Design a protein with these regions (language model features):
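N-terminal beta-strand motif that seeds the catalytic metal site of vicinal oxygen chelate
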Residues: 1-9
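Beta-strand-rich solenoid/repeat architectures in extracellular/passenger domains
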Residues: 77-78, 115
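Flanking helices and flexible, charged tails adjoining ferredoxin-like Fe-S electron-transfer domains
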Residues: 28-70, 90-91, 96-171
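Core segments of cupin and vicinal oxygen chelate
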Residues: 14-35
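Short, thiol/selenol-centered motifs that function as redox-active sites or metal-ligating centers
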Residues: 11-14, 92
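Mid-length scaffold segments of soluble, non-membrane domains
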Residues: 78-86, 94
Length: 171
């Protein structure tokens, strides 16, 4: 299954991914429309600031055996056939058990609807027929949408090419 993978060496914490996420999940699909919506949209991905001015975008990891799905008492959280963890907002009762169960803190307390908090989490832009909006918006290509095995292989190949092109050490 493809996942959003992060190159923390190139992320400059510009938050373009967060903005793209809000716009992609807005009713209007535009930045100005998203800003005007009430309740205000929250990104389903968050850039956490690290040391030395570096950022690290964090979102749902779409685990193979998700704790959040097991903790959901109303069965609002489920895994679709592609392996994406999704939420059926109509079934969500706002108990926040999934929020507590997620080991990555990737589930957010969303908007309050009818006195019940709904949750908000990354859905890999499942309704789009393309890469997730955050990946497309990243100006440094720090986010990629690919199979983790391919990502790992490509990283090894890149390292080997760099190693092969490095000047020999002088003793």
């Amino acid at each position: 299954m493809k996942r959003i993978l992060i190159n923390d060496e190139t992320c400059m914490a510009c938050h373009s991914c967060e903005i793209a996420c809000c716009v992609a999940h807005s009713k209007s699909g535009t930045l100005y429309g998203a800003l005007a919506e009430a309740p205000q949209l929250a990104s389903r991905l968050h850039v956490e600031q690290g040391g030395k001015g570096r950022g690290f975008p964090l979102g749902c990891r779409h685990c193979q055996d998700p704790h959040c799905v097991r903790a959901c008492v109303s069965k609002a959280l489920y895994v679709n056939p592609k392996g994406v963890v999704l939420v059926d907002e109509k079934r969500c009762i706002g108990c926040l058990m999934c929020f507590i169960a997620c080991p990555f803190g990737s589930i957010e307390k969303g908007s309050k609807a009818q006195e019940v908090y709904r949750i908000s989490k990354c859905d890999l832009c499942a309704e789009l027929d393309e890469d997730p909006a955050c990946v497309t918006a990243c100006p440094t290509k720090s986010l990629s949408f690919e199979d983790p095995d391919d990502f790992s292989r490509n990283k090894r190949v890149k390292y080997l090419i760099e190693l092969a092109n490095a000047p020999e050490a002088v003793a």
